């Protein structure tokens, strides 16, 4: 992960409109995974503000990777507010290290992950959204994936915290016909349509029914065998149905 320092200068820096416009701008960059920090902390500099952007590639932030919405907000900040942008490359993030974005893509998996919900199935490396064609119905962004990802993270958080809605949340995460899974499966279909790469939806699994029964379970949609021989609960996925485009894991709740 690369750190890029952005300095924004101008008389309108710090105004109400400035923070409104920059908020929309950075939200757009986050929605495409051009940056991975969902929150941004400003530091004062002469005649402006500075902040660090965390990017999958050195130039992830550039307009060539932006949606029309990201470009629009940047131009409004520059044009209406007369502000200047200065991007400076700082180096690799010591925590993340170098991000590997696979060029060869055997198949894709939709699953929430560290910075992008699209995972290459063989290498298990994540692919920023801006690396694939737009998936939203307006043909200009990835809002469909963003909305699903937001829902998934909130449901997952509800399950993880327990007590309040835990069973409902677990069913949403692990059942293929839940509202959450249906939303994600629709995203998978669209991703496969625009990329022409098989795209699978990841089904969470935390069933407490023992390893033997867990390994015997069939694809929940078609009922066919889908266990990958030799899989363990340490594997990222242990079940794969090519017909239904579903992938799942062995339960660690043994």
Task: Give the positions of each predicted feature.
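Surface-exposed cleft-lining segments at the edges of enzyme active sites
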Residues: 170-176
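Domain-scale terminal segments
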Residues: 1-170, 197
């Amino acid at each position: 992960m690369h750190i890029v320092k952005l300095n924004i200068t101008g008389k309108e820096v710090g105004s109400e409109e400035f923070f409104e416009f920059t908020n929309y701008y950075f939200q757009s960059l986050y929605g495409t995974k051009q940056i991975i920090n969902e929150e941004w902390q400003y530091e004062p500099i002469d005649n402006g503000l500075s902040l660090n952007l965390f990017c999958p590639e050195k130039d992830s932030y550039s307009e060539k990777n932006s949606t029309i919405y990201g470009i629009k907000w940047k131009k409004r900040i520059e044009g209406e507010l007369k502000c200047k942008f200065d991007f400076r490359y700082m180096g690799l993030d010591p925590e993340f290290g170098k991000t590997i974005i696979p060029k060869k893509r055997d198949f894709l998996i939709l699953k929430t992950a560290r910075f992008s919900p699209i995972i290459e199935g063989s290498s298990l490396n994540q692919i920023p959204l801006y690396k694939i064609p737009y998936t939203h119905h307006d043909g200009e962004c990835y809002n469909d994936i963003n909305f699903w990802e937001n829902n998934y993270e909130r449901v997952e958080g509800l399950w993880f915290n327990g007590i309040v809605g835990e069973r409902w949340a677990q069913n949403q995460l692990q059942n293929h016909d839940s509202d959450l899974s249906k939303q994600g499966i629709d995203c998978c279909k669209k991703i496969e349509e625009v990329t022409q790469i098989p795209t699978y939806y990841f089904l969470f699994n935390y069933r407490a029914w023992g390893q033997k029964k867990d390994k015997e379970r069939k694809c929940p949609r078609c009922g066919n065998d889908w266990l990958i021989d030799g899989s363990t609960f340490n594997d990222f996925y242990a079940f794969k149905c090519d017909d239904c485009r579903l992938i799942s894991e062995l339960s660690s709740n043994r």
